Amino acid sequence: MDSGLEYVPEEHLKKFATLLDRASFLGKAEAAQNDFMTYCKMVWPEFVNGRHHGIMAEKFNRLATGDLKRLIVNMPPRHTKSEFGSYLLPSWLMGKRPTLKIMQTTHTAELAFRFGRKTRNLMNSQEYRGIFDVELRADSQAAGRWETSKGGEYFAAGVGGAVTGRGADLLIIDDPHSEQDALSPTALEHAYEWYTSGPRQRLQPGGSIVIIMTRWAENDLTGKLLRQQARDVLADKWEVVEFPALMPETNKPLWPEYWKQEDLLAVKGSLSVGKWEAQWQQNPTSEGAAILKREWWQEWKKEDLPNLDYVMQSYDTAYSKKETADYSAITVSYTHLTLPTKRIV
């Protein structure tokens, strides 16, 4: 059947094709405005999608709707942690809400400014402007501090940096600890004190917090916040997502599209058990062991201890990966015969 298109002037066909392409793009742009994963694929075409990215995207969608207010994501290095949490997330949310005030923090000011610069440059790009009609103020575009034309603000700071006088609708904390911090209980405590005395107090009513980090130690920021949650019913209630590099049940990679099993096993073989379990499996343990700790053992001094026939020990370790597990218990008992009655004691 003759379509009749051969009678349409070529310039009209080109205009029609352009309109179709534009309509298709607008449909994708609208989808990207409402779905984080769609947005990621539009602004980052080379993105290698993994199962954990879908889980994170679902959490970020809930964050955008206000259904989720407190989120902790623990994940291994080189698994798109910062790209998702400190680059794509703030740019997406700022596009959806150009009046949003975002505070971005990480373990150094230099890295925080790098995140700010990268996010700012994305929002100034043609690709981004095709999705969101948001402009940045020409007189406020420093890497660590910039504003939208509609009153939104982005402020970046390193752990320990001054945040006084700043308000935040969204607080993003990306890896608050460095490698050196993991070796220093004082540094871990400092990061927690800075969080509670600084950024946490800058949050606006109804604001949200996202902590996305690699685990380093039992007393890192994740560990301290979860213990505080367990102790105080009024404390922040966190939704926690843990991503081990190798799945415990199968020993297969979390992100097989990018990480081969043999590559992860090579990393494992190059690290101490403690570093591998903390940083790559999100299961930090103390240097004294995970189940039975040295400081739990006590010497029982008893004069004239009789000859013992049997010594019995029982252990209820309450072993769990959770920071809020029940206490472990250890008991020691014994039996011996008393003479001349041969009564068991």
Predicted segments — roles?
Residues P176-M247:
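Signature of the SF2 helicase/ATPase Hel1-core->accessory helical subdomain module
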Residues T335-T341:
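Conserved small/polar residues in nucleotide/adenosyl-binding loops
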Residues E249-T317:
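ATPase catalytic-site recognition across NTP-hydrolyzing enzymes
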Residues T105-V163:
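Conserved nucleotide-state-sensing and coupling region of NTP-binding domains
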Residues G144-T186, Y192:
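Conserved RecA-like ASCE ATPase "motif II neighborhood" in helicase/translocase motors
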Residues Y315-S328:
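An active-site-proximal beta-strand-loop segment
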Residues N74-P76, K81-E127:
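Conserved P-loop
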Residues M1-K69:
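N-terminal accessory segments
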